[in-house]
């Protein structure tokens, strides 16, 4: 009991440390290493529990008993003479039987874990796209996929349980057979006068004790295979490329002025063949306000992600205050850039939680100031819980325009010197957008602003305009001159 308790305590401590380290690696991983399916990735993390179960299993204590089996064999040889050959022969036969079952079980468990990841991915995708399924009338199609996946998984689990049961019962049979053989052989030795009854009883008890650990180890076979595969996936998670490299010593820049230079950068998303950006060059002085327009898929949002250091350019440089972006600590960088993405979800929690995300220390006065500026204060006034109003998972309890207002308020909360706004009003109505634009006009003065938009009215916030098309800058200059060139067809297409 004490041994099992100590193992369980050690396993719990190991679990806490490993799970914390694992989550740290996940949140710190490079966006290039982000998995294609969230569900399968989540299942891999969930399977980590199987590793802890294996390490804390009571049957794992049987491994400690194995060395004592050799000592018991010596004792049987001393008191029972030739009877020692029965457990000596049964021991390797039992081990060989368990090993053969383990080989058959390995492939089954591996396929089972893969199907489990597919099922988890299917479930998460279904829950996230439930409205889409209902709108398209595709519930039955998804139901069929679920039944097929779950049915295959059930069959594999049943086969794995059968093999595990075969290993356990087969080992038990060999134990009992060895015990019977010991008694039968011992009787003949007693008749011949070469063994006493007491020695036979002792040999029988010691022989059973020798084979007992093998019976317990047979019960570990299934857990071992799951733990082995889980360890492989855990190793892959721990090896994920990180944003912060241990050998790097980033520069500490707690206050940036906002001068920005993009030098001939090119970028291709992982797993894609076509480049998203090709030979992009732009230069902004501190406090300059640039609007970026272009058709969907032209690379505007990709450029914003590179500026936030979510990804690194394959070629070229991005300089901020004459320093390469890769020399700056990503936390310091993002702390000084107000970023809004058109498809960025909110997190489950309250309005206050999302407004002050990453800046819980901010004062209520500052929070109210940006809430007034962006119109978020109206969301609090309209609800009896005020700023404790729940927003739901991914902000589903708010409209698209309301979510964008919250995101914009959060971007302005720390009064950053640089703003990167990617379609900040795409889901807002005209009235809300006009009111927000009027309030922002004074606030953005003196700040470096990069505004990506399809709304012509929002361009009143910028003095300069660049046009992206198919990953290239096809126009860059004063706003009025670029708009005039677009009207006359002297530059590539843009979406406004």
What are these regions (language model features)?
Residues 1, 61-111, 184-195, 212:
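Transmembrane helices of ABC transporter permease
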Residues 253-496:
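ABC-type nucleotide-binding domain
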Residues 243-255:
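Pre-NBD coupling/linker segments of ABC/ABC-like ATPases
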Residues 1, 91-93, 164-175, 184, ...:
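Hydrophobic alpha-helical segments in the permease module
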Residues 20, 24-25, 29-39, 111-160, ...:
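Loop segments that connect adjacent transmembrane helices in multi-pass transporters
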Residues 8, 115, 135-138, 162, ...:
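Cytosolic ends of transmembrane helices, especially the final helix of ABC transmembrane type-1 domains
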Residues 7, 27-71, 128:
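Juxtamembrane loop-to-helix connectors within ABC transporter transmembrane domains
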Residues 1-15, 86, 96-97, 197-198, ...:
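Transmembrane-helix motif of ABC transporter permease domains
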